[in-house]
């Protein structure tokens, strides 16, 4: 089962001119040709990030995203529309921050601290309304202590 917004190890099942199809339990999810690791063969596994493209199709990318589902990350605003802002996630598709999820007006170049979530249609999205996920518990580490 594919998990949108997560990294997964998937098996290469067939090669095509547009790339390689990875096993998703159905017809396969496309990893574009430009991102296919050299030497990848049928039945090899590859780690990919799963997302929806602009048309809603499920896609895979070997590019490293700046965050995955449920992460709180700082992302740059790339474009602003009347409905919200697009944030650079480091993959072929930017993540959308809907105007109802924006705390302050967004301008291109701004950095927004957001949580990566799934929207009502199951697509990866962002919210700037993150207070309910933050914890003000007292820190139990000492200065210069390494944390995971």
What residue spans do the PLM features occupy?
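Single-stranded RNA-binding regions, centering on S1/OB-family and related RNA-binding modules
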Residues: 1-148
């Amino acid at each position: 089962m594919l998990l949108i917004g997560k990294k997964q190890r998937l098996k290469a099942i067939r090669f095509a001119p547009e790339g390689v199809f990875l096993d998703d339990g159905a017809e396969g999810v496309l990893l574009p040709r430009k991102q296919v690791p050299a030497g990848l063969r049928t039945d090899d596994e590859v780690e990919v990030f799963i997302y929806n493209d602009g048309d809603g199709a499920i896609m895979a990318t070997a590019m490293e995203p700046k965050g995955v589902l449920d992460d709180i990350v700082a992302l740059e605003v790339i474009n602003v529309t009347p409905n919200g802002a697009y944030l650079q996630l480091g993959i072929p598709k930017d993540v959308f921050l809907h105007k109802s999820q924006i705390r302050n007006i967004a301008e291109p170049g701004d950095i927004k601290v957001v949580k990566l979530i799934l929207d009502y249609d199951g697509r990866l999205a962002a919210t700037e309304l993150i207070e309910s996920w933050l914890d003000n518990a007292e820190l139990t580490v000492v200065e210069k202590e390494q944390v995971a």
